[in-house]
Amino acid sequence: MLKVDNSLYCALSKIDPDFSKDWSKSFFTTFINLKNTRLYFSEPANKGYIIFSYTSFEIEIVSIFINLKYRRLGIASTLLEKVKEFAIKNKILRIVLEVSVENNIAMVLYKRFGFIEVGIRQNYYKKKNKLIDAKVMSYSI
């Protein structure tokens, strides 16, 4: 189990300025300490992270974020590869995620990685009093 203390929460908040808006400390602590939840940091450290949960057959990427200054350097691809390696090692059959329909850059990355669109979640995200749909994407191992 990952020890969640103030320094971990602060580290994530430094990478992602909106982290504390999206995750309260108590919710994050509870979630990250679940048995089937993982958090990977980027290399080099403190440039990005990926959080996922998993079952015996599926991984759900809950959050992936790369600091704006370090985007388009392959960090997100490296994090996705780490999740894929985890899936292969644990004989997990697929990886799923949701992405805002407005996040074209992320959708291009996911499609290049091999994800396909499998559905839409209406009004999934809230951004400045506006509801935004999410595309559900899946990658088969």
Write out the residue ranges for each language-model feature.
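Acetyl-CoA-dependent GNAT
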Residues: 2-69, 80-82, 86, 90, ...
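Short secondary-structure junctions
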Residues: 1-3, 116-118
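Structured loop/turn residues at beta-strand edges in well-structured enzyme cores
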Residues: 45, 90, 116, 130-132
